[in-house]
């Protein structure tokens, strides 16, 4: 091995160790916070399960060879809580409901960061089975959107029997891709937003009458390192602005009798489908990208979702740890 390649190998090994240590530190802090936070009595069993998973994840993350196992345990921290919290069905606006929202938002925000660190560690360890955190250097946004639309239309065909048409429109100065760095996790909010729009069309008129509605429109632009995507559908929209806001709150919009859907074969879906998790998780991913997700629309007409994000790759978490801690304490 040449001296240059050996130097690069050592740099990668050092960076992998840094990622592993950062993941261990995050999981240690998470376990400590879950053990110390005061919650209503009815939430104590949920907290105890989450704290136990966090402690196990912390122990696994302390050893480089078991980082992948640590991530699996980190998934359980939030995953175990969802069905338990769902059963509480607290009235919207109550103190317990507010605490549940804060608990889920904090847990899944931590989980997104854990996933990114674990994935980066695997990349630096040269694990060939791990996809890159970056979609592709200088990849045009329209290529990412075309891929997301194709995948989501495949999902809609499998679930409903047919998929709505989608028009992809470039808006503004979107021709330059120089310096563009799109993280792979932008795909998640795109899929969730497109999936909701396609589902609203199918539920409004039926899969066999989708041609009676105008196509879904996806507009996009990139300018000065900032990306914007707007998805507009004709699926009926929300009855009021408050309903649009509520749709991005955990566990609020789901039917309590509806079971999770595990059937989509391309695997980009989530085990939380059917639990009222899609849009809240999409919003957290948008914040992790340094942006925001906004929902609006005309009652009886359609919905409009606007996703803004940093397209330079410089942002990791839109909220610093101090801000997250303040949110958690207020809960």
What are these regions (language model features)?
Residues 240-247, 258-259:
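Short adenine-binding "F-helix/F-box" segment of the Bergerat
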Residues 159-162, 177-178, 196-234, 261:
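ATP-lid-like helix-loop hinge signature
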């Amino acid at each position: 091995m040449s001296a240059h390649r050996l130097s690069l190998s050592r740099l990668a090994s050092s960076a992998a160790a840094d990622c592993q240590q950062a993941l261990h530190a995050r999981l240690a802090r998470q376990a400590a916070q879950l053990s110390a936070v005061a919650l209503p009595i009815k939430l104590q069993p949920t907290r105890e399960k989450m704290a136990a998973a966090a402690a196990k994840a912390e122990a696994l993350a302390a050893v480089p060879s078991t980082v992948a196992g640590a991530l699996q345990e980190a998934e359980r921290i939030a995953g175990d809580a969802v069905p338990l919290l769902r059963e509480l069905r607290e009235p919207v606006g109550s103190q317990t409901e507010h605490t549940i929202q804060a608990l889920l938002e904090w847990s899944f925000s931590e989980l997104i960061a854990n996933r990114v660190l674990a994935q980066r560690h695997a990349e630096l360890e040269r694990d060939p089975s791990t996809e890159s955190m970056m979609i592709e250097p200088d990849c045009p946004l329209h290529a990412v959107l075309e891929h997301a639309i194709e995948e989501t239309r495949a999902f809609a065909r499998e679930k409903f029997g047919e998929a709505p048409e989608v028009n992809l429109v470039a808006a503004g100065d979107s021709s330059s891709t120089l310096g563009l760095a799109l993280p792979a996790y932008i795909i998640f909010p795109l899929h969730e937003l497109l999936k909701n729009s396609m589902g609203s069309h199918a539920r409004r008129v039926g899969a066999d009458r989708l041609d009676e509605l105008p196509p879904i429109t996806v507009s996009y632009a990139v300018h000065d390192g900032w990306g914007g995507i707007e998805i507009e559908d004709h699926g009926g929209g929300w009855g009021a602005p408050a309903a649009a806001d509520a749709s991005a709150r955990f566990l609020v919009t789901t039917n309590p009798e509806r079971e999770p859907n595990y059937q989509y074969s391309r695997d980009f879906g989530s085990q939380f489908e059917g639990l009222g998790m899609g849009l809240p998780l999409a919003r957290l991913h948008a914040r992790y990208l340094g942006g925001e997700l906004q929902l609006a629309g005309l009652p009886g007409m359609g919905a409009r979702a606007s996703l803004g994000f940093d397209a330079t790759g410089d942002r990791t978490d839109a909220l610093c740890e101090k801000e997250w801690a303040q949110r958690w304490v207020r809960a």
